[in-house]
């Protein structure tokens, strides 16, 4: 029989409990909403108070209403005895002067304060985690929407990429910051880059040719002058000088011919690259949209001093710069953490330099890096080598680790004049070699892997928030509304975490009791993080596939997780008895 039941983190709270909405309203009271939302009361001069509107937007999802219209035309109408209006709520949601980033930071700080009173996590690893995920949209008129490449599925989607900065407090992942990005289109950008390089080469070749041609004309003028002088008086010295000058002119003429051919070749290459760009603009246009589609997109004139204007600028900012900005903001806001974790997509010299600047605060880096062409200076040989060359150089230093069924090689290197350690890791027999970099020089392999696994909690957040909290489902054309709805979804996520901690987890001594049979039935994702590693490793061994990639796929895909759960259900039934 096919299992159709959703096994996400918060399924029972949203659908099964008829009193959840009222209970969560009580939970919301602990967050001191009046203080957080009250600072924006001046935005509205009359009508419904800002605090009431934002509070309503926060709790309406828990009354089984998936959008503002359904809530205010049904639920609100039943309560008030008349039809409610959705307009003030949409207007406030799209207001550029609301600092959604400040609201999210204040809400997260309040959650950590409340959570710390219920359970103590001192001594556990705290981390800042960065990861991105696609948010698919259906309307091409949405402001700043673009075609983007989903590196997980390999498909091109219409929408945004959301880059999330999350905080791991020792037991839970909470989102504290984010930015929305659009993609210009890598194929077109590459073609334009090649065209621009060809254009520079063509201009340089033409400049060199013209400069030499001017020199050649001067050389010929000297030769003609000597010829005229010989016609007047035939001196031996003049004849010798004329012969030398004639050779100079001959060499100059040959060089001019070579430079002319080089210039023509550069111009031909430039024409070819320009033709490629023209074809790409038709096949893969800017942002994946035609010029007419881009013109029809929603546009809004914003106050340049408003938070909404700054958020809109972030859509075209590089993710590397966004990561740096979020990292700096988190430190300034008083978040304390030991490590910064992210995948190979975000690692760069600039990010490493910024993290190194926080060494006095004890902040260190653990990140996956690509086995590409980046050069590292070996500490022993002082030679510059790429990752693959380094791994082969130290293959005799390979060590076996039973806990993770892994082989690894630890290599001390310099990267961008900064001392770091490279760990080359191979899990099982089906995985490929991967490289993990850290500037924590005292970190051992076991702690490295345990800490890096925390990064997958961000994948859990994406899955649960998209499935249950409507993350990224807003289809408003206004970019400010997109930011607002995402912020509300993240706040709802923290509300549910606190609600679960207060009503379900504290009596058992933990927020989430992942080892119980209830967790097996209702919390497949978290259960995977804690107990499935050996099973995933076994599957990887049998199928000869990459264990880490399989693990991430199981987190993202409910159906695959359920199928694997059914296959191994006899094992789970025997395990408690053992």
PLM feature spans:
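Short, conserved catalytic/metal-binding motifs centered on acidic residues
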Residues: 56, 71-73, 124-138, 165, ...
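Electropositive nucleic-acid engagement tracts
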Residues: 37, 43-48, 64-140, 146-147, ...
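Short, amphipathic alpha-helical "recognition" segments used to contact nucleic acids or chromatin
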Residues: 53-64
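Domain-level cores of phosphate- or acyl-group-handling catalytic modules
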Residues: 208-278, 286-380
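Short helix-capping/linker segments at secondary-structure and domain boundaries
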Residues: 63-69, 169-175, 495-506
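Active-site-proximal, Lys/Arg-enriched surface segment
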Residues: 3-5, 16, 37-41, 94-207, ...
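Short amphipathic alpha-helical "interface-anchor" segments enriched in bulky aromatics
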Residues: 24, 128-134, 444-476
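A short, flexible helix-boundary coil/loop motif
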Residues: 1-48, 76-80, 182, 191, ...
């Amino acid at each position: 029989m096919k299992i159709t039941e959703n096994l996400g983190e918060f399924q029972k709270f949203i659908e099964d409990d008829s009193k959840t909405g009222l209970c969560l309203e009580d939970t919301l009271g602990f967050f001191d909403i009046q203080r957080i939302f009250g600072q924006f009361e001046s935005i509205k001069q009359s009508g419904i108070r800002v605090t009431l509107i934002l509070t309503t937007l926060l709790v309406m999802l828990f009354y089984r209403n998936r959008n503002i219209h359904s809530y205010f035309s049904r639920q609100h109408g039943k309560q008030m005895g008349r039809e409610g209006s959705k307009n003030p709520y949409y207007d406030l949601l799209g207001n550029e002067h609301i600092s959604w980033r400040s609201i999210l930071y204040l809400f997260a700080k309040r959650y950590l304060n409340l959570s710390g009173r219920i359970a103590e996590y001192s001594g556990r690893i705290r981390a800042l985690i960065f990861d991105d995920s696609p948010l698919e949209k259906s309307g091409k008129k949405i402001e700043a929407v673009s075609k983007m490449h989903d590196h997980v599925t390999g498909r091109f989607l219409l929408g945004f990429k959301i880059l999330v900065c999350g905080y791991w407090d020792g037991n839970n992942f909470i989102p504290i910051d984010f930015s929305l990005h659009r993609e210009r289109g890598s194929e077109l950008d590459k073609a334009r880059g090649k065209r621009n390089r060809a254009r520079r080469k063509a201009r340089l070749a033409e400049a060199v040719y013209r400069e030499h041609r001017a020199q050649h004309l001067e050389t010929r003028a000297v030769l003609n002058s000597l010829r005229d002088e010989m016609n007047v008086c035939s001196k031996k010295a003049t004849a010798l000088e004329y012969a030398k000058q004639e050779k100079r002119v001959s060499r100059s003429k040959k060089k001019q011919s070579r430079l002319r051919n080089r210039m023509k070749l550069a111009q031909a290459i430039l024409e070819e690259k320009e033709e490629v760009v023209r074809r790409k603009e038709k096949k893969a246009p800017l942002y994946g949209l035609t010029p007419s589609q881009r013109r029809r997109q929603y546009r809004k004139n914003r106050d340049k001093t408003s938070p909404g204007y700054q958020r809109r600028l972030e859509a075209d900012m590089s993710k590397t710069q966004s990561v740096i900005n979020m990292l700096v903001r988190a430190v300034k806001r008083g978040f304390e953490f030991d490590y910064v974790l992210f995948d190979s997509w975000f690692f760069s010299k600039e990010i490493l330099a910024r993290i190194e600047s926080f060494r006095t605060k004890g902040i260190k880096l653990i990140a996956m890096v690509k086995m590409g062409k980046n050069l590292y200076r070996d500490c022993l040989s002082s030679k510059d080598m790429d990752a693959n060359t380094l791994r082969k150089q130290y293959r005799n230093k390979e060590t076996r680790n039973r806990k993770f069924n892994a082989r690894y090689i630890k290599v001390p290197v310099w990267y961008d004049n900064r001392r770091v350690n490279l760990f080359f890791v191979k899990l099982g027999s089906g995985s490929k070699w991967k490289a993990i970099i850290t500037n924590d020089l005292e970190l051992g392999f076991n702690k490295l892997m345990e800490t890096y696994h925390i990064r997958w909690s961000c994948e859990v957040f994406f899955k649960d928030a998209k499935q249950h909290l409507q993350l990224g489902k807003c289809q408003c054309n206004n970019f400010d509304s997109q930011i607002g709805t995402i912020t509300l979804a993240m706040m709802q996520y923290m509300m549910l975490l606190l609600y679960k901690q207060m009503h379900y987890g504290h009596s058992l001594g933990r927020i989430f009791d992942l080892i119980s049979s209830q967790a097996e039935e209702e919390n497949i994702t978290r259960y995977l993080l804690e107990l499935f590693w050996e099973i995933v490793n076994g599957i990887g061994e049998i199928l000869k596939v990459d264990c880490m990639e399989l693990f991430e796929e199981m987190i993202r895909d409910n159906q695959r997780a359920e199928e694997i759960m059914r296959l191994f259900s006899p094992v789970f039934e025997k395990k408690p008895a053992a």
